[in-house]
């Protein structure tokens, strides 16, 4: 009888603990370290953006120096300014908050209070610029690619901070962070990685470490029309 009571007590403790742990998991459309998110779920536009602004036209930016590459994620060559605009990330920050980030490719994020791991759920409507779907496999591919062949700054951070990454489904991916590292900013770090198309790199046998004037396939709002090297 005593054994049965002990078993029931242990079971109740386990179930209570499990419920508490589940209650401590946060599901949100964004994340902020300092204070609450400014924008609610499904917000239509940022407060400093004019949704009725004229579409089309021409815009010019300037930058110091010259360039001979449109690949900003390799040590080879000198990448042109704004050569990263062809790619999107899971999360995107805003200009009117200190450190908030909202789902871009990701629809929502799930994480515990200690931020020891994070699950990203991707939007089903996100496509690469060639019309192919962007899935969690592309996110995993991009993470591994940057960890193995990316800039030293990417490699160092991903190697030190991330314990593992695993696919849950076509639309879900989980990152588990190393126990011994500070975790406050790690969700933002992973959420800010550029996402590449695994199929594009495989089908075209693209060498990620090579300098090139042809940007890889991305899901961003821009594609390259032409480039004048050094101008």
Residue ranges of model-derived segments:
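Short, intrinsically disordered, charge-balanced linker/junction segments flanking boundaries
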Residues: 18-21, 223-231
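N-terminal lobe/hinge region of extracytoplasmic solute-binding protein
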Residues: 23-114, 144, 203-204, 214-225
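Surface-exposed binding/hinge segments that line
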Residues: 121, 156-202, 221-223, 228
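Aromatic- and charge-enriched surface segment that lines or borders ligand/interaction sites
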Residues: 49-54, 75-82, 108-152, 168, ...
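Bacterial N-terminal signal peptides
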Residues: 9-18
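Solvent-exposed loop/turn segments at secondary-structure junctions
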Residues: 65-69, 116, 125-127, 146-149, ...
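Bacterial N-terminal signal peptides that target proteins for export
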Residues: 1-8
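Short, solvent-exposed loop/turn and secondary-structure capping segments
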Residues: 71-74, 132, 185-189
């Amino acid at each position: 009888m005593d054994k049965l009571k002990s078993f029931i007590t242990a079971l109740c403790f386990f179930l209570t603990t499990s419920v508490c742990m589940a209650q401590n998991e946060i599901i949100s459309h964004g994340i902020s370290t300092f204070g609450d998110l400014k924008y609610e779920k499904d917000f239509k536009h940022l407060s400093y953006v004019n949704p009725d602004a004229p579409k089309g036209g021409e815009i010019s930016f300037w930058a110091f120096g010259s360039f001979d590459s449109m690949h900003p994620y390799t040590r080879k060559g000198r990448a042109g300014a704004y050569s990263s605009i062809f790619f999107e990330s899971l999360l995107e920050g805003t200009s009117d908050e200190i450190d908030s980030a909202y789902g871009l490719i990701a629809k929502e994020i799930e994480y515990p209070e200690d931020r020891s791991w994070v699950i990203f759920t991707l939007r089903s409507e996100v496509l690469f610029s060639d019309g192919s779907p962007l899935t969690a496999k592309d996110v995993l591919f991009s993470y591994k690619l940057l960890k193995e062949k990316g800039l030293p700054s990417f490699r160092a951070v991903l190697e030190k901070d991330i314990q593992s990454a695993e696919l849950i489904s076509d639309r879900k991916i989980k990152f588990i962070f190393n126990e011994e590292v500070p975790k406050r900013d790690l969700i933002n770090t992973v959420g800010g990685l550029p996402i590449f198309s695994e199929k594009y790199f495989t089908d075209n046998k693209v060498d990620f470490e090579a300098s090139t004037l042809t940007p890889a396939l991305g899901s961003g709002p821009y594609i390259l029309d032409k480039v004048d090297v050094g101008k």
